[in-house]
Amino acid sequence: MNKGTITQIISAVVDIAFKDELPAIYNALKVKLEDKELVLEVEQHLGNNVVRTVAMDSTDGLKRGMEVIDTGKPITIPVGKAVLGRILNVLGEPVDNQGPLNAETFLPIHREAPEFDDLETETEIFETGIKVIDLLAPYIKGGKIGLFGGAGVGKTVLIMELINNIAKGHGGISVFAGVGERTREGRDLYGEMTESGVITKTALVYGQMNEPPGARLRVALTGLTVAENFRDKDGQDVLLFIDNIFRFTQAGSEVSALLGRIPSAVGYQPNLATEMGALQERITSTKSGSITSVQAVYVPADDLTDPAPATTFSHLDATTVLSRNIASLGIYPAVDPLDSTSKALSEDVVGKEHYEVARKVQEVLQRYKELQDIIAILGMDELSDEDKLTVSRARKIERFFSQPFSVAEQFTGMEGKYVPVKETIRGFREILEGKHDDIPEQAFLYVGTIEEAVAKSKDLAK
């Protein structure tokens, strides 16, 4: 058994000297404390037989000279059916007070991405039941989806609604990785999943805001390893939710500074693209099964050009951008219909009718955006009749993009709506064709299908 001694402790970073053989990079080391066993992960070889490690838990109670044992392998976690319905931490230990896991299979969290010839490349649409997403930025089965937004514009609520809509209808396995977010939200999600019965097909892996940077950096890999096992061993189509991928980058930046690396742009770690690539390339579909991932991406100061969101962009198949301007109009989900994109929005994938309606909707909204300056200065009266009609339809389209969510029922008092793609296309096509030009725009706010808008307009007229 390879043993070493602690020589230096700086916050979450611990240096350890080994007399004989040095442990490999990413090996897990263990230190016995009074009430627990602390796990450290090797990050650097410094020379003079010293390795630099990052702690996966608080370093309180550590002292220089303490004995450290090399496990000879990376952090290894339980996977398979045993983890369903349970909450795990970064080390795969249950933290839900429901007894030990009786897992048969264990896997290291550091693994290679699938081989090139194992990948599956067919494109199939994933229906979410959320109008604005299904119409303008449709999600791909086995694809990577990013939800971009600043603080408080609704990323987590949207992720919870997607879990509610997709996980319930999907019937497959879901894995939720809570990376550096609020513990309260994690608790709420667990409660909601337990109530709806989805929990029996879900594994939750949490490394929240209060955890040290090492745990926040690695917890996404723990969740991903659980999802990979369901894909590879059981041939499942797995849903992987990550909230929030920015915190993964943020933790990497903290660890990088503690390890003494020279920072790059905006103070981020120099290996930002490499770290992100190592995670994202493992989230993919193979011949045996698929992983569809939905990742919330916090955008610092609403700046999409910040290196963290910008690096994430390049890995995604669909991006749903949440806008503070739309949220300020009281339209939720606050998805920006002109900024959100999807590789699947092409005639070959979604079909001619869907593609044409989506493009026409974007055209009308873009024209409205151009006219807003004129309206602000000269007022609506100065517009031509054609432009007035465009503005009227654009405002109806904007409001029709709003939708009551099931997960927000307790706050809004409105019953959540799931709208099939066919109904979404039909509704927007009818607005574009002018069939509902006589209906006031308020009738389109927070309804599901177009019939509900018509019914609401009759109620308003009473």
Curated annotation (Swiss-Prot):
It comes from the Bacteria. It is found in: Cell inner membrane. InterPro entries: AAA+_ATPase, ATP-synt_VA_C, ATP_synth_F1_bsu, ATPase_a/bsu_AS, ATPase_alpha/beta_chains, ATPase_F1/V1/A1_a/bsu_N, ATPase_F1/V1/A1_a/bsu_N_sf, ATPase_F1/V1/A1_a/bsu_nucl-bd. Disulfide bonds: none annotated. It catalyses: ATP + H2O + 4 H(+)(in) = ADP + phosphate + 5 H(+)(out). Keywords: ATP synthesis, ATP-binding, Cell inner membrane, Cell membrane, CF(1), Hydrogen ion transport, Ion transport, Membrane, Nucleotide-binding, Translocase, Transport. Its EC number is 7.1.2.2. CDD domains: ATP-synt_F1_beta_C (cd18110), ATP-synt_F1_beta_N (cd18115), F1-ATPase_beta_CD (cd01133). The keyword Cell membrane applies. ATP binds at residues 149-156. Its main location: membrane. One of its GO terms (cellular component) is plasma membrane. SMART domains: AAA. It is a peripheral membrane protein. Produces ATP from ADP in the presence of a proton gradient across the membrane. The catalytic sites are hosted primarily by the beta subunits. F-type ATPases have 2 components, CF(1) - the catalytic core - and CF(0) - the membrane proton channel. CF(1) has five subunits: alpha(3), beta(3), gamma(1), delta(1), epsilon(1). CF(0) has three main subunits: a(1), b(2) and c(9-12). The alpha and beta chains form an alternating ring which encloses part of the gamma chain. CF(1) is attached to CF(0) by a central stalk formed by the gamma and epsilon chains, while a peripheral stalk is formed by the delta and b chains. PANTHER family: ATP SYNTHASE, ATP SYNTHASE SUBUNIT BETA, MITOCHONDRIAL. This is ATP synthase subunit beta. It comes from Fusobacterium nucleatum subsp. nucleatum (strain ATCC 25586 / DSM 15643 / BCRC 10681 / CIP 101130 / JCM 8532 / KCTC 2640 / LMG 13131 / VPI 4355).
